[in-house]
């Protein structure tokens, strides 16, 4: 979800003035290219369409495979007994079942070996077998295993994103007001956890005759916006959408709602997605960016 900042960086400085002045030919081409890159991200192995499961991993032994006796059940295409995770505190090992070929980060492994755990939402070591990949991550003592599948039903049935028509009226310049010190935001996610993020300031802008305000969080050298509006739960995803921008320059930020996109949770029920804070609910319809096809 915080992954697309590079998609707008290359052309943003050159195109900003042309966009705001209404150079639609260049702008339409840019949006088209952005959407192609976005679609490629969704279909990639790190995207949401490969994800088919998220499981808690308690202390002790957790067996993995397609057999109904396994703690974590995989699709029937997987081996009946892939192996077992052994967790003792923050020490995690994996022992494959004899005869099952597994790789860790692309390297063949055998016998019992340690697994590096990532910090949510970033996974640790990638364990591969057949069409499947599993990885372990942890946060506040909670360990979770994600399962990815090259033949995921979400990937096979994905028809591409739906979009509002490109509209330069939703390309706006906002005034950025920095906070004296970054403000801590408590951001809940769709798995029930709450994370603390830093808001460097807020932005105000005019849209559809309204003066609106959003509070972003800092990501890298840019800003990340989580928002809802009056299309949420109707034409767009009910939990809200995301938007990224460059960092403020001369007290201004360009917001391009034609690049508003859905959280990963819009594509499968297993992703962990931050939920927009209440103050980021806009009292207008943002008829720009990605729509929601439905499905879960």
What are these regions (language model features)?
Residues 175-231, 237:
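Flexible, glycine-rich surface segments
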Residues 83-87, 132-138, 174, 212-216:
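Broad, structure-driven detector of short, well-ordered beta-strand segments within folded domains
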Residues 160, 230-235, 246, 252-296:
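Extended, aromatic/histidine-rich regions of cofactor-dependent oxidoreductases associated
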Residues 132-194:
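Surface-exposed beta-loop interaction hotspot
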Residues 21-55:
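N-terminal pre-domain segments of enzymes
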Residues 106-119, 211-259:
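An exposed acidic His-Trp-rich patch
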């Amino acid at each position: 979800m915080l992954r697309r900042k590079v998609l707008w960086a290359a052309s943003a400085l050159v195109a900003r003035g042309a966009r705001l002045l209404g150079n639609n030919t260049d702008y339409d081409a840019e949006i088209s290219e952005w959407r192609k890159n976005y679609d490629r991200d969704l279909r990639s192995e790190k995207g949401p369409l490969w994800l088919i499961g998220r499981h808690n991993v308690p202390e002790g032994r957790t067996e993995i495979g397609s057999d109904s006796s396994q703690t974590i059940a995989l699709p029937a295409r997987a081996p009946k007994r892939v192996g077992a995770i052994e967790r003792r505190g923050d020490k995690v090992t994996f022992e494959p079942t004899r005869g099952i070929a597994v790789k860790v980060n692309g390297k063949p492994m055998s016998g019992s070996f340690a697994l590096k755990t990532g910090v949510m939402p970033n996974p640790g070591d990638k364990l591969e077998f057949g069409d499947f990949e599993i990885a372990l991550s942890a946060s506040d003592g909670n360990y979770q295993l994600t399962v990815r599948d090259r033949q995921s039903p979400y990937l096979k049935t994905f028809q591409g994103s739906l979009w509002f028509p490109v509209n330069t009226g939703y390309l706006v310049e906002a005034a950025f007001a920095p906070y004296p010190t970054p403000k801590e935001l408590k951001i809940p996610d769709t798995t029930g956890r709450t994370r603390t993020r830093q808001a460097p300031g807020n932005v105000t802008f005019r849209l559809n005759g309204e003066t609106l305000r959003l509070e972003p969080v800092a990501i890298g050298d840019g800003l990340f916006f989580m928002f809802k509006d009056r299309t949420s739960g109707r034409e767009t995803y009910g939990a809200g959408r995301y938007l990224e921008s460059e960092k403020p320059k001369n007290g201004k930020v360009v917001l391009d709602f034609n690049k508003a996109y859905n959280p990963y949770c819009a594509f499968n029920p297993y992703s962990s997605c931050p939920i927009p804070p209440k103050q980021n609910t806009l009292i207008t319809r943002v008829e720009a960016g990605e729509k929601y096809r439905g499905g879960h």
